Amino acid sequence: TADGIDSTDPGRPDRLVARAGVASPGDVADAVDRATRAQPAWARRPPQERAEALRRAANLLRAERHTLAALQVRECGKPWAEADADVCEAIDHIEYAVHQALSLADGKPLLQLPGERNQLRYRPRGVVAAIGPWNFPLAIPAGLVATGLATGNAVILKPAEQAPASGHRLVQALRRGGVPDDIIQLLPGYGETGAALVAHPGVHTIAFTGSEPVGLSIIRAAADTSHEQRHVKRVVAEMGGKNAIIVDSDADLDQVVPDVLRSAFAF
């Protein structure tokens, strides 16, 4: 695109780490259209086949563990230990999604009554928009994306504008593992790109991790049902509510302050 995102090293802003395009509303519409057309064939694949593609992707990330950690150090300013942990967590998220999807593939039994055979079966939703944060640029997007892919959905990932290269490496690994190009797509950009993706009537589910204001705006936008839709959008929004900290009046502030900082930015 004519516009671009320069991803720079937070510790040395003059050092360019990566350059990404900015997806326009037209790019969003094209991505959703391609995902919509490709998704039924992906959903028809045996769950084991989808799982194998994701397992291969996880192994590719494992083989590039140190390179991916180095990218986070440069792109997001993460300490080495935290960057390495983020890569490891991304691998864990993908493998966990595979395990859970396979356990759900044959459905789950429900209460059985005389003359009835009751069973719960899960079906793919369709097109999933995954919007990830900058501070865990591989682990959280991997979890958002892998659960959708493993269960037969097409996924469009909008990475944080501060970490487009990490999002690109995740999509690369998934495609090299065997996920079709139209089933996993990357749409880098700013808030306008995410807003266009959320508002598109062809999107069925939105998985988001980030700030409370953005999360609430996503919930409001998803509730606005277009006449072009035949479905109600579902939203999974994690907005940092787990980070509340209570400090008693008799606490040692010299100990509290570094502990709070560590808890906010570490595993």
Question: Which residues fall in each region the model found?
Answer:
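Hydrophobic face of amphipathic alpha-helices that form TPR/SEL1-like repeat modules
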Residues: 1-19
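Glycine-rich loop-to-alpha-helix module at the N-terminal edge of alpha/beta enzyme cores
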Residues: 13-105
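Hydrophobic packing residues within well-ordered alpha-helices of enzyme cores
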Residues: 94, 167-170, 197, 218
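Conserved small-residue-rich beta-alpha loop and adjacent elements
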Residues: 107-181, 254
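A structured beta-alpha segment of the ubiquitous adenosine-cofactor-binding alpha/beta core
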Residues: 117-118, 185-207
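Short beta->alpha connector loops at strand-helix junctions that form conserved
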Residues: 158-160, 188, 248
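ALDH superfamily catalytic-core signature
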Residues: 178, 199, 213-267
